[in-house]
């Protein structure tokens, strides 16, 4: 008997069974991911100016040469990275460093730090004659650590040829000259340049081109904080980037800004509110659409700096402040996972002040962009049917994960066919985010 597949409206010549198989299962929408914090290292004193480094929790020290430090070093900039990594999966750092490079002349060479800034003054170089040979070893130190060593060298040209350039650059009038031994000598005259508002503007502009979830701005300068708030509003409302920023003592009234108004002690150090923003940014980036950070403990923290009284806490919440408290177990915890929105309207109700709810809305917006890219579907009844199927599957996925509730798939995601003409398709979508049970009221009857 004849058989095979068939095309609609194309008749077969031979009698037989012709069978087409077609899956009715809808394509599963891809999910967006979270976990990335963005930190500007303002005046780091080392590293490529305007350089962008991507650090991961799997290998946080992969960029030691460009940071000039291990993230575990006792250093205020590294502290920011460490605090963010307590919850973030990825930390992207943007380096602002417009200082002068440290230099030194030794052994007939000029030795210049790879980057500007005062960290270059901690670099030392030694040229040592190798035993039993007419060759030399050149060693590069950063602080007490030997970071590079080149052996079997005879001339300056030999050294230049093998030098990585990660820490220092060697130059000489005559590179063919033989190396000569010299004791360990420190580079000097490296300076940290003054940070200008234009440097902050350059960082904020660069942030448009990077994929991240939460930015920490670890400075308490009013005009710079205003610039950050303006940029976040622009990114959310004009660019469609579902991001938030964490700032210290920033009086704002916007769901994209988290206003941190106290801090905590860690490793014997009292952090400023600006430094505490790093942990908040990491925790916010690391939390997903079904998670709240209310009452989450701060790993390693021992005390609250600027602990609020009951009345102060009530007022702070009313003003949209994010702050730390002490739990009954004597742990430093987040009092309430809220953003700075505190003046509510019919379009921005009180639930928009809850960061878990914002993560639901932001994640859904990201998933819509992943599921419905331009030029993927036909703008006709067949295309609308496919798109509605995908959208309703997305709603069901969110409901199954516990991110939204009260889903009526048919009425909560559909194409407005009367408006969908040409290359424009309009959707009507309904969402009710699930929040965490954070205020529990018990009516107890005693007998």
Description of each model-found segment:
Residues 1-93, 251-447:
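Structured, hydrophobic secondary-structure cores that serve as assembly/anchoring elements
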Residues 88-295:
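Extracellular Cys-Trp
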